[in-house]
Amino acid sequence: MTHTLRVIFAGTPEFAAAALAAIHEAGFPVPLVLTQPDRPAGRGMKLQASAVKRYAVEHGIPVAQPPSLRRAGKYPGEAADAIELLRTTPHDVMVVAAYGLLLPQEVLDIPRAGCINIHASLLPRWRGAAPIHRAIEAGDAETGVTLMQMDVGLDTGAMIEEARVAIAPDDTTATLHDRLAADGARLIVDALVRLERDGALPATPQPADGVTYAEKIGKHEAALDWRKPADVLARQVRAFDPFPGGVATLDGAAIKLWAAEPVAARGDAVPGTIVDAAPEGVIVACGSGALRVTQLQKPGGKRLPAREFLAGSPLAAGQRFALPDGA
């Protein structure tokens, strides 16, 4: 089906690329894509295009990569050029998903139908940069995707529609991300169809109660504090897959833990102490309960099931993982 509603798209990672693909494949004209500049990544730290840019280039969609859209920011010239490009590119609405750049009021005012954001949480809970990670880390039973009409606040715009998603006990950020990306793609296509048909989308202001913020994940958060309860640490491991991973330091080596589950405590071992190292999992004492770690990765190695990890890097009861620096 061919549509007439013209959509400028702004986004960067895979979550956004899923939405761009759905919009494009649904037949909406996409005259321009905005995405962040190429960044160094991987072992060789070579410049890598974003997932959104890769899709746009593959499908012949024009791409712009301004480092900023704020005239008063660090890149005023580039911002001015990008804003002029937006003004001179005929379009009706802008869709924004995990773009990573702030949109000033000047930009929000350019599209006739405004800017619609796809946010990976049930707003107003988990506004901010890392809503999927924080929902798992906090032990939320459900999360979802919200479409909102953007304003200059941080994810404060009026809500157009939402989809709810249960968080499974074994969900990681990676697995939950994929389901939310699919839901976001479906929601935005449905919303654009209605916008084209009706000329506007009803939106409801966010409630004042229940606001929380999902701060960006930092590498410093990766270190496991074994004094915490086992269920808290298990959620941390799941929340930090694929980035930055849960990290446990043993004899100066940072071992990444990728899968773990809380189990009953065994004895009264000091938190961080390995109480059993079996093929089924490495059991580590925690502040309350214990953690069975079933997937590990040594420095420079690959993720391995506990059985394979122990075959090449034996661990033994009585060894103790260090507490985080400053603990």
From Swiss-Prot:
InterPro entries referenced in this protein's UniProt entry, alphabetically: Fmt, Formyl_trans_C, Formyl_trans_C_sf, Formyl_transf_N, Formyl_transf_N_sf, Formyl_transferase-like_C_sf, GART_AS, Met-tRNA-FMT_C
KW Transmembrane helix (keyword) present: no
Catalysed reaction equations from the record: L-methionyl-tRNA(fMet) + (6R)-10-formyltetrahydrofolate = N-formyl-L-methionyl-tRNA(fMet) + (6S)-5,6,7,8-tetrahydrofolate + H(+)
Top-level taxonomic group: Bacteria
Keyword Protein biosynthesis in record: yes
Primary role: Attaches a formyl group to the free amino group of methionyl-tRNA(fMet). The formyl group appears to play a dual role in the initiator identity of N-formylmethionyl-tRNA by promoting its recognition by IF2 and preventing the misappropriation of this tRNA by the elongation apparatus.
Family: Belongs to the Fmt family.
Protein name: Methionyl-tRNA formyltransferase
Originating organism: Burkholderia ambifaria (strain MC40-6)
